[in-house]
């Protein structure tokens, strides 16, 4: 794909349809069946600590990244946590994911955020390679999940 036909946009209040389409894309790429909660989408797009950047090919959502700004208690400022990043399967490996991360990093710099972090499962070699290629530093950690 020629990237000159891809546009990038930071979603905000009023872009609920685009966010809805991104959630459907996440479901497709991650092979999940998450519901689209319209109320949560509206609330998230009105939350200044939430960032959603989307890649469009013409008017179709073909990729996106979501992240949360988390206030630090041990140092001034905050950090950014990437929650999800996905690109439509047919558009992967064309620079769209890298550009989404680059756009998020620029948004962080503009806000004075000095650290961005993301989790990738060790078994997801593609994701691990992707973040390493972008210059991310890897740390061995364990994630614990509690079902409530």
What are these model-derived regions, one by one?
Residues 85-92:
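A short, internal acetyl-CoA/4′-phosphopantetheine-binding micro-motif in the GNAT/acyltransferase core
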Residues 5-21:
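A short beta-loop-alpha structural element at the N-terminal edge
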Residues 54, 60-69, 86:
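Conserved beta-strand in the GNAT
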Residues 93-106, 133:
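Conserved acetyl-CoA-binding loop-helix of GNAT-fold acetyltransferases
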Residues 31-52:
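Active-site rim helix/loop that mediates acceptor-substrate recognition in acyltransferases
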Residues 101, 109-120:
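Conserved GNAT acetyl-CoA-binding A-motif
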């Amino acid at each position: 794909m020629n990237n000159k036909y891809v546009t990038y946009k930071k979603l905000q209040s009023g872009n609920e349809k685009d966010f809805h389409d991104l959630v459907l894309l996440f479901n497709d790429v991650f092979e999940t069946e998450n519901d689209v909660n319209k109320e949560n989408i509206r609330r998230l797009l009105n939350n200044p600590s939430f960032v959603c950047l989307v890649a469009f090919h013409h008017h179709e959502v073909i990729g996106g990244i979501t992240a949360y700004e988390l206030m630090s208690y041990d140092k001034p400022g905050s950090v950014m946590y990437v929650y999800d990043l996905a690109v439509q399967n047919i558009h992967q490996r064309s620079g769209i994911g890298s550009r989404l991360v680059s756009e998020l990093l620029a948004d962080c710099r503009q806000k004075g955020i000095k650290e961005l972090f993301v989790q990738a499962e060790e078994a997801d070699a593609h994701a691990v390679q992707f973040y390493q290629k972008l210059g991310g530093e890897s740390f061995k950690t364990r994630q614990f999940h509690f079902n409530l």
